[in-house]
Regions:
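An interfacial alpha-helical scaffold signature
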Residues: 1-242
Length: 242
């Protein structure tokens, strides 16, 4: 039997004080292809799974159904999400994955209990970045021109990194997260998009959201979009994969 995996939770969070030995149906929760969700016990944990029959590539609908299961579990307890598309071909493969990663799972549960993830997207469109965002094409042959272009490319990369770092520090001061994960990339409009994930206490979500207006005032010329709370995808120890 193949299992599609959604997330890992502490066994007691879905089964109370009962120590299950076999997969237990989770009432009112459906997964990909509207399949019944089961809590598959493995030591201190339960893996939220559904029976999996390959029918081709998993599309957008499956992605939304995967996210729905993780979000519903997140409302009740701490979750360690699996990457979308994670499938275990056998019961033993599933149990082995949990057994081999048990230490990392325990560390993540302790770290993330009572925590949530918030997202901020900062779109920078001001003219000061236009030159820094232009990509430098390297000549096909090695020589003085190649080295000159290579240096120019490195300078522009540092300019982008410096701008992103300065903004992330400013945003950190406004929102005071426990941890943050930052990445930036060029967008087609010629600007730069900085994607920031913040780890915060779940009880402080409203306080965090209330600081949004402050952020927009302190970041003129920058479009700021907030979303969350989400399960803490960016802050899990190690990777959850088959």
């Amino acid at each position: 039997m193949a299992w599609y995996a959604y997330c890992i939770v502490e066994q007691q969070s879905v089964q109370g004080g009962i120590r299950a030995r076999r997969p237990v149906p989770v009432e009112g929760l459906k997964g990909i292809a509207d399949a019944q969700i089961f809590a598959y016990p493995s030591g201190d944990f339960s893996v939220l799974v559904s029976e999996y029959i390959p029918t081709g590539d998993l599309g957008q609908k499956a992605l939304l159904q995967h996210a729905h299961v993780v979000s519903e579990c997140f409302k009740r307890t701490t979750v360690l999400p699996f990457r979308f598309g994670t499938v275990f071909d056998t019961d033993e493969a599933l149990r082995r994955a949990v057994r081999l990663n048990r230490k990392g799972f325990l560390e993540s549960v302790i770290k993330l209990k009572g925590k949530a993830e918030m997202h901020l997207k900062l779109l920078i469109k001001d003219g000061s970045l236009r030159e820094a965002m232009e990509e430098i094409e390297l000549p096909a042959t090695v020589g003085s021109e190649y080295l000159s272009k290579l240096r120019e490319k490195a300078v522009r990369q540092r300019e982008r990194q410096t701008k992103a770092r300065a903004l992330s520090v400013q945003v950190h001061k406004i929102f005071s997260p426990l941890e943050q994960d930052v990445c930036c990339r060029k967008v087609n409009s010629g600007g730069m998009l900085i994607d920031i994930a913040h780890l915060i206490d779940h009880k402080k979500v409203e306080k965090y959201q209330n600081r949004f207006q402050m952020a927009t005032r302190h970041l003129p010329g920058i479009e700021v979009v907030m979303s969350g709370p989400w399960p803490p995808y960016h802050f899990i120890t190690g990777k959850r994969s088959s």
